[in-house]
């Protein structure tokens, strides 16, 4: 992957790269397995740049972890360019391999797609969602882009079906911490990290509410913990009090997302 720049002010190449968001690790990788080219000549980070110099940054080629075993299965692709891939994930699928589910993750499915489409790329999941939550996932096509995305605010909107009749709208402001009795679950705790969830009820039928949810913070299991906390657990979420005989996963979906693309323009899906 290559990025091109025109220099506006004299400065050292290393300084310029740092200003563009290249981390020390990325710069080190470029030195060993990439290239820095100024006006057609290969240079080092100590090169003194002048106004109007043309700089090419060739990122280091990445190698996928041996733990990622690619497999081919049709992806639900919502958006793709040379920098990012945005897909819709099914429920019952991890974003990345875990101790309990070592293979058939979304990352491995995407790696299979890249190989099938002859893209020598390692996927970097930007917006992870829980195994049994479905919906939109953003993927960076290089670690550098993943690094840039870490500093970009992403607006995510979810849909869920929960038990009981929710109020027409509201905000749940309750801090969340790890459950000391579990390595998986979280709980509302006054000593936890701030967590704020905004919701709007869209429909109510037969003791079930359909809600649209916006996260103002991004804690692990935030929606699930908050809805349990107010007495309206998500249908199918047996981990947080919403077990249901007809649904074996929580009825929770990330269905809308928007953010400023790190290279191009606004993305809204």
Q: Could you say what each language-model-derived stretch is?
A:
Residues 1-267:
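RNA pseudouridine synthases
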């Amino acid at each position: 992957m290559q990025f091109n720049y025109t220099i506006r002010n004299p400065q050292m190449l290393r300084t310029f790269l740092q200003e563009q968001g290249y981390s020390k690790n990325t710069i080190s990788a470029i030195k060993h397995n990439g290239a820095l080219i100024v006006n057609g000549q290969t240079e080092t980070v100590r090169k003194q740049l002048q106004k109007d110099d043309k700089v090419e940054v060739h990122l280091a080629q990445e190698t996928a972890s041996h733990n990622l075993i690619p497999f081919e299965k049709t992806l639900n692709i919502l958006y793709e360019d040379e920098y990012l891939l945005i897909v819709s994930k099914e429920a019952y699928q991890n974003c990345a391999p875990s101790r309990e589910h070592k293979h058939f993750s979304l990352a491995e499915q995407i790696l299979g797609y890249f190989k099938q489409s002859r893209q020598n790329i390692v996927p970097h999941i930007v917006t992870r969602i829980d195994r049994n939550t479905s919906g939109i996932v953003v993927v960076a096509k290089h670690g550098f882009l993943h690094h840039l995305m870490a500093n970009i605010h992403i607006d995510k909107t979810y849909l869920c079906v929960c038990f009981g009749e929710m109020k027409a709208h509201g905000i749940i402001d309750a801090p969340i911490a790890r459950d000391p009795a579990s390595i998986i679950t979280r709980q509302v705790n006054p000593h936890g990290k701030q967590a704020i969830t905004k919701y709007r009820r869209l429909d109510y039928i037969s003791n079930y509410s359909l809600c649209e949810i916006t996260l103002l913070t991004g804690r692990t299991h935030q929606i699930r913990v908050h809805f349990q906390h107010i007495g309206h657990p998500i249908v199918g979420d047996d981990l947080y009090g919403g077990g249901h005989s007809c649904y074996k996963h929580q009825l929770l979906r990330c269905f809308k997302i928007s953010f400023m693309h790190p290279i191009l323009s606004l993305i809204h899906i």
